[in-house]
């Protein structure tokens, strides 16, 4: 029964576009909700800078991102552990992923239920996306049904942090 105080430099998450999934078009690059960072100019890109949206509101970047729910690669976590970061192997962090999520697919060895973060399948499935995935498979890129099992290589529909048509963020779960 622990409580966590979340402190953010930005304001409350009362801006309506924060909660609407397509609202990231109105929150990214908006100084009210985004720090509006840019990368350093890169000579390999003709000295262009690329926007690097970071949330400036309660919930941080989880309040302005594209809602994708994709964990890191299992091997990356294991490398962190091998570098001396105890508690950071895939097997160490997986229980926390399970505890955090309320997975609409239900509980299994890679997903949990009852946590504060609602995770659901992407609702929009378009023929052009299916054609893209079929083409990728034809050239040897595997289809992935679940990007959160530790091996993200491939293409497929991702899951999102959304519940009842609204964004789930660090501020609202």
Please tell me what each predicted stretch does.
Residues 1-99:
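N-terminal glycine-rich phosphate/pyrophosphate-binding loop and immediately adjacent elements
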Residues 81-173:
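Conserved redox-cofactor binding core of oxidoreductases
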């Amino acid at each position: 029964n622990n409580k966590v105080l979340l402190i953010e430099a930005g304001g409350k998450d009362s801006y309506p576009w924060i909660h609407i999934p397509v609202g990231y078009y109105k929150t990214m690059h908006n100084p009210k909700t985004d720090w509006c960072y840019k990368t350093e100019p890169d000579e390999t890109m003709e000295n262009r800078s690329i926007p690097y949206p970071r949330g400036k509101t309660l919930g941080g970047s989880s309040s302005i991102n594209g809602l994708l729910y994709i964990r890191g690669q299992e091997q990356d976590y294991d490398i962190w552990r091998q570098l001396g970061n105890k508690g950071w192997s895939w097997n160490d962090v997986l229980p926390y992923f399970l505890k955090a999520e309320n997975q609409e697919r239900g509980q299994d060895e890679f997903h949990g239920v009852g946590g504060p973060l609602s995770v659901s399948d992407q609702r929009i499935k378009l023929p052009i996306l299916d054609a893209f995935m079929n083409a990728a498979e034809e050239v040897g890129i595997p289809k992935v049904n679940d990007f959160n099992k530790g091996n993200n290589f491939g293409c497929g529909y991702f899951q999102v942090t959304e519940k009842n048509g609204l964004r789930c963020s660090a501020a609202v779960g």
